[in-house]
Protein backbone atom coordinates (compact mmCIF):
# COMPACT_ATOMS: atom_id res chain seq x y z
CA UNK A 1 0.00 0.00 0.00
CA UNK A 2 2.82 2.39 0.91
CA UNK A 3 4.58 1.68 -2.39
CA UNK A 4 1.38 2.38 -4.31
CA UNK A 5 0.87 5.71 -2.53
CA UNK A 6 4.50 6.66 -3.14
CA UNK A 7 4.18 5.84 -6.84
CA UNK A 8 1.04 7.97 -7.10
CA UNK A 9 2.81 10.84 -5.32
CA UNK A 10 5.85 10.68 -7.59
CA UNK A 11 3.65 10.53 -10.69
CA UNK A 12 1.76 13.61 -9.53
CA UNK A 13 4.98 15.48 -8.77
CA UNK A 14 6.40 14.59 -12.16
CA UNK A 15 3.44 16.15 -13.95
CA UNK A 16 3.72 19.31 -11.86
CA UNK A 17 7.49 19.66 -12.12
CA UNK A 18 8.07 18.76 -15.78
CA UNK A 19 6.77 21.25 -18.39
CA UNK A 20 4.53 19.70 -21.02
CA UNK A 21 2.49 21.02 -23.90
CA UNK A 22 -1.29 21.20 -23.97
CA UNK A 23 -3.74 22.10 -26.67
CA UNK A 24 -5.02 25.65 -26.93
CA UNK A 25 -8.51 24.45 -26.01
CA UNK A 26 -7.33 23.25 -22.58
CA UNK A 27 -5.31 26.36 -21.75
CA UNK A 28 -6.60 29.09 -19.51
CA UNK A 29 -7.26 32.72 -20.48
CA UNK A 30 -4.26 34.38 -22.12
CA UNK A 31 -2.75 37.71 -21.26
CA UNK A 32 -2.57 40.30 -24.04
CA UNK A 33 1.14 39.61 -24.73
CA UNK A 34 0.41 35.87 -24.87
CA UNK A 35 -2.51 36.41 -27.24
CA UNK A 36 -0.42 38.61 -29.53
CA UNK A 37 2.45 36.14 -29.59
CA UNK A 38 0.15 33.23 -30.41
CA UNK A 39 -1.75 35.14 -33.09
CA UNK A 40 1.49 36.17 -34.79
CA UNK A 41 2.89 32.64 -34.53
CA UNK A 42 -0.17 31.28 -36.27
CA UNK A 43 -0.09 33.91 -39.00
CA UNK A 44 3.63 33.30 -39.58
CA UNK A 45 3.04 29.56 -39.85
CA UNK A 46 -0.18 29.78 -41.89
CA UNK A 47 -2.06 28.05 -39.08
CA UNK A 48 -5.81 28.26 -38.45
CA UNK A 49 -7.80 30.26 -37.72
CA UNK A 50 -5.63 32.99 -39.29
CA UNK A 51 -3.90 30.83 -41.88
CA UNK A 52 -4.84 33.21 -44.71
CA UNK A 53 -3.90 36.45 -42.95
CA UNK A 54 -0.58 37.85 -44.14
CA UNK A 55 2.05 37.97 -41.37
CA UNK A 56 2.64 41.66 -42.09
CA UNK A 57 -1.08 42.40 -41.76
CA UNK A 58 -1.16 40.54 -38.46
CA UNK A 59 1.77 42.57 -37.12
CA UNK A 60 0.10 45.80 -38.18
CA UNK A 61 -3.19 44.87 -36.54
CA UNK A 62 -1.62 43.64 -33.31
CA UNK A 63 0.36 46.87 -32.98
CA UNK A 64 -2.96 48.73 -32.70
CA UNK A 65 -4.39 46.48 -29.96
CA UNK A 66 -3.82 47.49 -26.34
CA UNK A 67 -6.49 45.51 -24.51
CA UNK A 68 -8.45 42.27 -24.64
CA UNK A 69 -11.66 44.09 -25.56
CA UNK A 70 -13.34 42.38 -28.56
CA UNK A 71 -14.15 45.67 -30.27
CA UNK A 72 -10.54 46.84 -30.13
CA UNK A 73 -9.44 43.58 -31.78
CA UNK A 74 -12.08 43.94 -34.48
CA UNK A 75 -11.31 47.60 -35.23
CA UNK A 76 -7.62 46.89 -35.80
CA UNK A 77 -8.39 44.31 -38.48
CA UNK A 78 -11.30 46.24 -40.01
CA UNK A 79 -8.93 49.10 -40.79
CA UNK A 80 -6.73 46.77 -42.86
CA UNK A 81 -9.72 45.13 -44.53
CA UNK A 82 -11.07 48.53 -45.55
CA UNK A 83 -7.77 49.30 -47.23
CA UNK A 84 -7.95 46.10 -49.26
CA UNK A 85 -11.51 46.97 -50.29
CA UNK A 86 -10.36 50.32 -51.67
CA UNK A 87 -7.60 48.57 -53.61
CA UNK A 88 -10.10 46.04 -54.95
CA UNK A 89 -12.56 48.66 -56.14
CA UNK A 90 -9.78 50.52 -57.93
CA UNK A 91 -8.46 47.34 -59.56
CA UNK A 92 -11.92 46.42 -60.87
CA UNK A 93 -11.51 49.04 -63.57
CA UNK A 94 -8.40 47.50 -65.11
CA UNK A 95 -7.46 44.13 -63.60
CA UNK A 96 -10.16 41.72 -62.45
CA UNK A 97 -7.62 39.16 -61.20
CA UNK A 98 -5.99 41.72 -58.93
CA UNK A 99 -9.42 42.88 -57.81
CA UNK A 100 -10.37 39.32 -56.89
CA UNK A 101 -7.17 38.92 -54.87
CA UNK A 102 -7.77 42.16 -52.98
CA UNK A 103 -11.40 41.25 -52.26
CA UNK A 104 -10.13 37.89 -50.99
CA UNK A 105 -7.60 39.54 -48.68
CA UNK A 106 -10.29 41.91 -47.41
CA UNK A 107 -12.63 39.02 -46.63
CA UNK A 108 -9.86 37.10 -44.85
CA UNK A 109 -8.91 40.07 -42.67
CA UNK A 110 -12.53 40.90 -41.86
CA UNK A 111 -13.00 37.23 -41.02
CA UNK A 112 -10.15 37.47 -38.51
CA UNK A 113 -11.81 40.57 -37.08
CA UNK A 114 -15.11 38.82 -36.39
CA UNK A 115 -13.51 35.56 -35.13
CA UNK A 116 -14.52 33.45 -33.27
CA UNK A 117 -18.04 34.83 -33.17
CA UNK A 118 -19.94 38.06 -33.78
CA UNK A 119 -20.55 38.99 -30.13
CA UNK A 120 -19.82 42.73 -30.06
CA UNK A 121 -20.80 45.74 -32.21
CA UNK A 122 -17.49 45.90 -34.08
CA UNK A 123 -17.35 42.13 -34.58
CA UNK A 124 -20.86 42.25 -36.05
CA UNK A 125 -19.73 45.07 -38.34
CA UNK A 126 -16.69 43.02 -39.34
CA UNK A 127 -18.93 40.10 -40.30
CA UNK A 128 -21.13 42.33 -42.45
CA UNK A 129 -18.03 43.64 -44.19
CA UNK A 130 -16.70 40.10 -44.61
CA UNK A 131 -19.92 39.04 -46.34
CA UNK A 132 -19.76 42.05 -48.68
CA UNK A 133 -16.11 41.42 -49.58
CA UNK A 134 -16.75 37.73 -50.10
CA UNK A 135 -19.72 38.43 -52.37
CA UNK A 136 -17.46 40.46 -54.66
CA UNK A 137 -14.70 37.86 -54.53
CA UNK A 138 -17.13 35.05 -55.28
CA UNK A 139 -18.30 36.72 -58.49
CA UNK A 140 -14.77 36.93 -59.87
CA UNK A 141 -13.45 33.42 -59.28
CA UNK A 142 -13.96 30.42 -61.55
CA UNK A 143 -16.31 28.72 -61.14
CA UNK A 144 -18.15 31.59 -59.46
CA UNK A 145 -19.96 31.38 -56.14
CA UNK A 146 -23.73 31.54 -56.47
CA UNK A 147 -25.64 32.96 -53.50
CA UNK A 148 -28.77 30.85 -53.09
CA UNK A 149 -31.81 31.60 -50.98
CA UNK A 150 -34.53 29.13 -50.15
CA UNK A 151 -37.75 29.39 -48.12
CA UNK A 152 -37.64 28.28 -44.52
CA UNK A 153 -40.43 28.74 -41.98
CA UNK A 154 -41.56 32.08 -43.34
CA UNK A 155 -38.02 33.36 -43.81
CA UNK A 156 -35.23 32.90 -46.32
CA UNK A 157 -32.18 30.81 -45.58
CA UNK A 158 -28.90 31.69 -47.30
CA UNK A 159 -26.28 29.31 -48.68
CA UNK A 160 -23.65 29.13 -51.42
CA UNK A 161 -23.33 26.90 -54.46
CA UNK A 162 -20.39 26.27 -56.79
CA UNK A 163 -20.73 23.84 -59.66
CA UNK A 164 -17.99 22.30 -61.83
CA UNK A 165 -17.79 23.75 -65.32
CA UNK A 166 -18.64 20.77 -67.50
CA UNK A 167 -20.74 18.39 -65.36
CA UNK A 168 -24.54 18.66 -65.43
CA UNK A 169 -26.33 17.63 -63.37
CA UNK A 170 -23.53 17.76 -60.83
CA UNK A 171 -23.20 15.60 -57.72
CA UNK A 172 -22.69 17.62 -54.54
CA UNK A 173 -20.77 17.85 -51.32
CA UNK A 174 -23.26 19.35 -48.84
CA UNK A 175 -20.77 21.20 -46.60
CA UNK A 176 -21.78 22.44 -43.14
CA UNK A 177 -19.46 24.93 -41.43
CA UNK A 178 -18.04 24.42 -37.95
CA UNK A 179 -18.59 26.43 -34.80
CA UNK A 180 -16.12 29.22 -35.59
CA UNK A 181 -15.84 28.81 -39.37
CA UNK A 182 -18.49 30.00 -41.79
CA UNK A 183 -19.99 28.82 -45.07
CA UNK A 184 -17.65 31.19 -46.90
CA UNK A 185 -14.71 29.10 -45.73
CA UNK A 186 -16.40 25.91 -46.88
CA UNK A 187 -17.24 26.97 -50.42
CA UNK A 188 -13.81 28.25 -51.47
CA UNK A 189 -11.52 25.72 -49.80
CA UNK A 190 -12.74 22.60 -51.59
CA UNK A 191 -11.59 23.19 -55.16
CA UNK A 192 -10.29 19.63 -55.44
CA UNK A 193 -13.89 18.44 -55.51
CA UNK A 194 -14.71 20.88 -58.30
CA UNK A 195 -11.73 19.69 -60.35
CA UNK A 196 -13.14 16.18 -60.09
CA UNK A 197 -16.63 17.13 -61.26
CA UNK A 198 -18.27 17.51 -57.84
CA UNK A 199 -20.11 20.66 -56.79
CA UNK A 200 -20.07 22.36 -53.39
CA UNK A 201 -23.14 23.49 -51.46
CA UNK A 202 -22.14 25.36 -48.29
CA UNK A 203 -24.35 26.40 -45.39
CA UNK A 204 -23.86 27.76 -41.86
CA UNK A 205 -24.66 25.43 -39.00
CA UNK A 206 -27.42 26.56 -36.58
CA UNK A 207 -26.36 29.28 -34.19
CA UNK A 208 -23.68 30.67 -36.49
CA UNK A 209 -23.33 33.04 -39.42
CA UNK A 210 -26.55 33.62 -41.35
CA UNK A 211 -28.37 30.53 -40.13
CA UNK A 212 -32.04 31.29 -39.39
CA UNK A 213 -31.96 28.97 -36.34
CA UNK A 214 -30.14 28.76 -33.04
CA UNK A 215 -28.63 25.47 -31.92
CA UNK A 216 -31.45 23.35 -30.51
CA UNK A 217 -32.96 19.91 -30.74
CA UNK A 218 -34.44 19.59 -34.22
CA UNK A 219 -32.46 22.43 -35.79
CA UNK A 220 -31.33 20.04 -38.51
CA UNK A 221 -34.65 20.77 -40.20
CA UNK A 222 -33.00 23.73 -41.95
CA UNK A 223 -30.77 21.23 -43.75
CA UNK A 224 -33.82 19.23 -44.81
CA UNK A 225 -35.24 22.43 -46.30
CA UNK A 226 -31.96 22.90 -48.16
CA UNK A 227 -32.28 19.40 -49.63
CA UNK A 228 -35.83 20.27 -50.70
CA UNK A 229 -34.43 23.26 -52.54
CA UNK A 230 -31.62 21.33 -54.20
CA UNK A 231 -34.14 18.84 -55.57
CA UNK A 232 -35.72 21.66 -57.58
CA UNK A 233 -32.53 22.43 -59.50
CA UNK A 234 -31.94 20.81 -62.87
CA UNK A 235 -28.18 21.45 -62.66
CA UNK A 236 -27.82 19.42 -59.45
CA UNK A 237 -27.94 15.63 -59.22
CA UNK A 238 -30.04 15.41 -56.06
CA UNK A 239 -29.59 11.64 -55.99
CA UNK A 240 -25.85 12.01 -55.44
CA UNK A 241 -25.37 14.23 -52.41
CA UNK A 242 -22.93 13.53 -49.57
CA UNK A 243 -23.02 15.58 -46.37
CA UNK A 244 -19.74 16.75 -44.84
CA UNK A 245 -19.74 18.23 -41.36
CA UNK A 246 -16.59 20.05 -40.25
CA UNK A 247 -15.68 20.27 -36.57
CA UNK A 248 -18.87 20.62 -34.50
CA UNK A 249 -20.88 20.31 -37.71
CA UNK A 250 -19.93 16.63 -37.61
CA UNK A 251 -22.78 16.41 -35.10
CA UNK A 252 -25.26 17.63 -37.71
CA UNK A 253 -23.78 15.39 -40.39
CA UNK A 254 -24.26 12.37 -38.12
CA UNK A 255 -27.88 13.33 -37.47
CA UNK A 256 -28.55 13.75 -41.19
CA UNK A 257 -27.13 10.27 -41.67
CA UNK A 258 -30.35 8.88 -40.24
CA UNK A 259 -32.92 11.67 -40.63
CA UNK A 260 -32.17 12.01 -44.36
CA UNK A 261 -30.88 8.51 -45.11
CA UNK A 262 -33.29 8.17 -48.04
CA UNK A 263 -32.13 11.37 -49.76
CA UNK A 264 -28.36 11.38 -49.31
CA UNK A 265 -25.62 8.96 -50.30
CA UNK A 266 -23.70 9.28 -47.05
CA UNK A 267 -22.17 11.56 -44.44
CA UNK A 268 -18.62 12.45 -43.44
CA UNK A 269 -18.04 13.43 -39.81
CA UNK A 270 -14.92 15.58 -40.15
CA UNK A 271 -14.01 16.81 -36.72
Feature names for model-found ranges:
Residues 25-78:
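N-terminal alpha-helical interaction modules that lie
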Residues 77, 118-167:
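N-terminal cap/lid segment of alpha/beta-hydrolase-fold proteins
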Residues 169-178:
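Short beta-strand element of the alpha/beta-hydrolase
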Residues 176, 203-205, 270:
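Alpha/beta-hydrolase
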Residues 179-191:
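The serine-hydrolase catalytic nucleophile loop
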Residues 185, 214-236:
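Alpha/beta-hydrolase active-site loop
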Residues 193-210:
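Conserved alpha/beta-hydrolase
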Residues 229-271:
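Primarily recognizes the serine-hydrolase "nucleophile elbow" in alpha/beta-hydrolase
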